[in-house]
Amino acid sequence: MTTNLEPGRPAAGVLLYWLPLGAGGHFVRWNGRLYEAVTARRRHRPAADLYHSALEVLIDADRHVIEMAPVWATRAADRGVVVEGPVGLPWLGRFAAFRYEVRRWRAGVIPDLAEAVDGPHLVGDDAARARRLLELVPQAPPVTWGRDELRTGDMWNSNSLIAWLLACSGHDMRTVGPPARGRAPGWQAGLVLAARRQEGRRSCPQRHAGPDAQLVQRVEWR
């Protein structure tokens, strides 16, 4: 069960942040609202607030930030990039403007953290699960952002990554979700992909890569 943290942090824990889509950027925010308005109208439901998720993983004195973001979003040289993938269409990934990266960033920062809704949510405080989550980050599938190449019924994006990592590392997902009246597009894709592990489809790989592994997984841009 997720809980909001009181002052002071656990020695080990996985903290989930919900950031309003487009926090800090009007272009993304307004496009997100337009997308949600169209989607809600098609599905005959009220429009919801859209959220982007990120994680902070604490193990003793170490702190890692886990996030999917555009490759051009920060100039920090050592930001723990372990996976890269294309945005929109596979062949567009050859251009940096259409490429995302997955970060496992030691002592990293989450842009616009001050805009997170309801502060950090403690998903779990088990050190073994936290380590397992860190090991899984480089194994995230580098599929195309915004598309459903894995046939999960939902598009792949930052929320998919976070849901996949939490579920594959053994966290209880039954009470984990966006804030009230909110929606996290892509979240279901991560849960579906994680569930395939239980069905013997090996969607959560068993090989291990420690928190300091430097290998970056990339697709071949077609």
Please identify what each model-predicted range represents.
Residues 3, 219-221:
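Intrinsically disordered, low-structural-confidence terminal and linker regions
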Residues 131-139, 164, 185, 189:
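Charged/polar, solvent-exposed surface patches and flexible loops
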